[in-house]
């Protein structure tokens, strides 16, 4: 276990803020995009290349920086995980994009990891919706460049997504009532 990994897992257990390495400063995001064959000019590519990034291996969360970020450790030269973690969130939580269909999420769906429960919870939004949220309060467009490197707190995201989902639920109810 590297010192960074130990610090990261200790912080996870203590429910405190996570340490992350700046993907833009060390080129880690570009390495991750290349390892997962994500086009750098796609919406996901823009976010990965300009956001903080963490990987998951063997059921444990690991923190890497620079060229180590998605270092390969298998004979068949595959990345550590089918999950790609995004975001440095100050009150101790991470978001991830599922890269395959799993029991808890479909491919491309965003999940939320709560350090309190250490469980992944599907958020009911896909990658595009997550990126729209990440960029909508800023001047950049979806095809623009991530300038600030900031990401809002999970509370702010949860509030935003809850409001959006409530609105969609109300619209669905109105449509159902109108059809009846």
For the regions a language model picked out, list residue spans one by one:
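A surface-exposed partner-binding patch
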Residues: 1-102, 164-180
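Intrinsic-disorder-associated interaction segments
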Residues: 1-5, 120-124, 150, 154-161
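Short alpha-helical interface elements
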Residues: 57-58, 64, 68-73, 111, ...
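A short, terminal or domain-edge coil/loop segment
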Residues: 71-79, 108-109, 142-149
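A short local loop/turn or secondary-structure capping micro-motif enriched for an aromatic residue
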Residues: 104-106
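Compact, glycine/acidic-enriched structural inserts
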Residues: 108-144
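Acidic, proline/glycine-rich low-complexity IDRs
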Residues: 141-180
């Amino acid at each position: 276990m590297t010192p960074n990994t130990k610090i990261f897992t200790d912080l996870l257990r203590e429910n405190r803020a996570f340490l992350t390495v700046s993907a833009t400063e060390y080129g880690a995001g570009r390495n991750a995009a290349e390892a997962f064959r994500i086009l750098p000019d796609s919406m996901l590519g823009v976010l990965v290349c300009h956001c903080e990034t963490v990987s998951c291996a063997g059921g444990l969360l690991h923190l890497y920086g620079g060229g180590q970020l998605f270092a390969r450790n298998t004979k068949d030269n595959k990345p550590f995980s089918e999950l790609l973690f995004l975001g440095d969130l100050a009150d101790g939580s991470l978001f991830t994009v599922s890269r395959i269909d799993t029991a808890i999420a479909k491919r491309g769906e965003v999940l939320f990891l709560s350090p309190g429960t250490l469980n992944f919870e599907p958020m009911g939004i896909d990658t595009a919706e997550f990126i729209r949220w990440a960029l909508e309060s800023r001047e950049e467009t979806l095809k623009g460049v991530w300038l600030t490197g900031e990401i809002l707190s999970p509370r702010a995201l949860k509030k935003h997504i809850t409001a959006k989902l409530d609105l969609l639920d109300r619209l669905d109810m109105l449509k159902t009532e109108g059809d009846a």
